[in-house]
Amino acid sequence: MRFLTFFLLLNTFLFAQEGVWYKDMDHALANPDSVFQLQLKRKGLNAFPSELSQFPNLQKLDLSKNKIGAFPDSLNHLINLTFLDLSRNKIASIPASISQLISLEHLDLWHNDVDALPYQISELPNLNYLDIRGVSMSHGDYGKYKELMKGVDFYMSAPCDCQD
């Protein structure tokens, strides 16, 4: 009976933690198994934090408005990730290994330096939202991806040299 009570309390606690956005890496690292949502926007990051591998339950990751230049080829450990916001960074390319993020539903690449998407992005089985506004691709490429990814809400526009 005690075990059952403990198990139910633990599940209730973990379920309650799913709605919490951690906004500080040190705080998140203090309890990595309870990190479901991590928001590190406007932190001046130049790269994906290597500590991401310590969050096995991570579902939502917001790295927007940083200076990240490269999308690592080694995010396959984030199998529970459903939401990834990389908008307003300096990412130049997306690796084919993005197809390993099989739970990904929402991908925001708005305002990056990407000039092409890997074909494998169309293999994400749960993707239903893709924002590639401001990505430098030809109109033909936009059409190709839109055709390959029917059922995905596509947000796209030509890039601009806008000043904030």
Residue ranges of model-derived segments:
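Sec-dependent N-terminal signal peptides
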Residues: 3-13
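Boundary at the C-terminal end of the N-terminal hydrophobic targeting segment
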Residues: 14-18
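The feature encodes a structural signal of leucine-rich repeats
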Residues: 26, 48-51, 71-74, 94-97, ...
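LRR N-terminal entry segment and analogous cap-like coil->beta motifs
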Residues: 29-69
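Leucine-rich repeat
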Residues: 31-33, 53-58, 76-81, 99-104, ...
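Conserved hydrophobic beta-strand positions in leucine-rich repeat
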Residues: 36-40, 61-63, 81-86, 104-109, ...
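Leucine-rich solenoid repeat scaffolds
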Residues: 113-164
